[in-house]
């Protein structure tokens, strides 16, 4: 199957301010994707990791490496933060797509379990 990569997310954000940066005609894209072999759509631009579906296809929105946007700032505007940067790992398996958001900011260990 195909992995489709677009810069602007083809789905709205939970924040009205961030939704301004979404793809302009997502319904046109959805119409083209129906019945296609696209397994996942990857995007970014918002600097906030997220997930959704478009035409029944999973959409993974990557966070930002340079900075992270504050999704809790909500509809007051846009606030960039120096913490909470991340990237997304995508693994393709027969019949499955798995995504994982990986934080890259400094953090403290709460607990650790060593196996093996």
Regions found by a protein language model. Name each.
Residues 1-60, 89, 96-97, 113:
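His/acidic metal-ligating clusters that form di-metal
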Residues 53-116:
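Binuclear metal-dependent phosphoesterase catalytic core
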């Amino acid at each position: 199957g195909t992995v489709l990569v677009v810069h602007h997310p083809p789905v709205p954000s939970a924040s009205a301010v961030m939704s301004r940066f979404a793809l302009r005609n997502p319904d046109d894209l959805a119409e083209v994707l129906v019945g296609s072999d696209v397994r996942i759509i990857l995007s970014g631009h918002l600097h906030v990791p997220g997930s959704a579906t478009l035409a029944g296809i999973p959409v993974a929105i990557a966070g930002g490496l340079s900075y992270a946007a504050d999704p809790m700032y909500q509809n007051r505007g846009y606030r960039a933060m120096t913490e909470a940067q991340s990237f997304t790992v995508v693994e393709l398996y027969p019949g499955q797509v798995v995504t994982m958001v990986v934080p890259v900011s400094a953090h403290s260990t709460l607990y650790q379990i060593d196996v093996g």
